[in-house]
Amino acid sequence: MRETGATDEGHACEVVVAGGDGKAAAARRRRRLELRRLGLAAEDDAAAKRIRSVKDGSSSDDSSTEVVPRSWPACVSHGSVSVIGRRREMEDAVAIERTFMASTGDGAGAIRGGGEGEEDFFAVYDGHGGSRVAEACRKRMHVVLAEEVSLRRLRGQSASGGDVRWKEAMLASFARMDGEVVGSVAAAAPRVDGTEPSGFRTVGSTAVVAVVGRRRIVVANCGDSRAVLSRGGVALPLSTDHKPDRPDELERVEAAGGRVINWNGYRVLGVLATSRSIGDYYLKPFVSAEPEVRVVERTDKDEFLILASDGLWDVVSNEVACKIARNCLNGRAASMFPESVSGSSAADAAALLAELAVSRGSRDNISVVVVELRRLKSRAA
């Protein structure tokens, strides 16, 4: 369902909803009152009206949470939201591809031991200098990754090396994606007046990618977008932000001949506030496109996964973000305020997190993906 309306500031506000749990109107029901009732809102009455897009989807699996690993679905449900916030342009992009390995067409993408052929792909891309690179990643990254994984399987690599295979595939995928973006910059046609389109050289994007399978979760991060797993009520970060003042990143930038300058925050060459990204042709080799990859085995304590751009994480801690998502997914908000809050879907959780970020003063675009890994017990009550 697609709707277009007007926000409180007169800007166009586009809402896109994809149903799965019957929560198609989730984004429209989000208001400051909901956040205040959860005791987590700040005083910003316009916060909830800046939603640009919402997506929600789910599987039909409603089985008990007390299951063995082999019967876990890769993903019970998911929801996402992208909010333009106080920026003039939306530069973020979100990608969600259920059972994305099927995109290889011949089944070769299914990895032995890596989820028994069912892997879901989720990603948040935080663009800067424009949306060109983030959009390119949204369209291509999952395709490139499926190709890289399939290639490794066809080479006959051992199933026992699953973690290494995933890391290699992620590294190769990010390198290919960066190569495609940089190549498009180099091949860009000159303007009508004959000058070079130098603006393309200053466009880039962070990327946090999660592949969720039945047995493991693989996260690759390049930049300061972040992935956080809620495991047994504890917020477990699955990525580490690439900030220019991070000691190892500072050392890497300087070793490449660059400098980190404190200019309204630490920035590479005084320009970019992240030390790794895809694109940013003009800052290479100081800014790297190589991701850090983490592979974690799933447990029966895993509840949900949050991926988000720094528009959320700059103002909301990992712990608070997980608390809000948990309140939505376990149905607590709906049971307390059934007349105004549905509060039991991943889309509700993503929308509330984005609203909280705006109400707390985030000045960036905000994109959030919430992936429900199992039904929380109180939800069925």
Curated annotation (Swiss-Prot):
Its cofactor is Mg(2+); Mn(2+). Its EC number is 3.1.3.16. Mn(2+) 2 binds at residues 126, 310, 364. GO terms for cellular component: nucleus. Residues 50-69 are annotated as: Disordered. It catalyses: O-phospho-L-seryl-[protein] + H2O = L-seryl-[protein] + phosphate; O-phospho-L-threonyl-[protein] + H2O = L-threonyl-[protein] + phosphate. Mn(2+) 1 binds at residues 126-127. It is an enzyme of class 3 (hydrolase). Protein phosphatase that acts as a positive regulator of seed germination. Involved in the positive regulation of alpha-amylase gene expression. Acts as a negative regulator of abscisic acid-mediated responses. May function directly by dephosphorylating ABI5 and suppressing its activity. Belongs to the PP2C family. This is Protein phosphatase 2C 51. The gene is PP2C51.
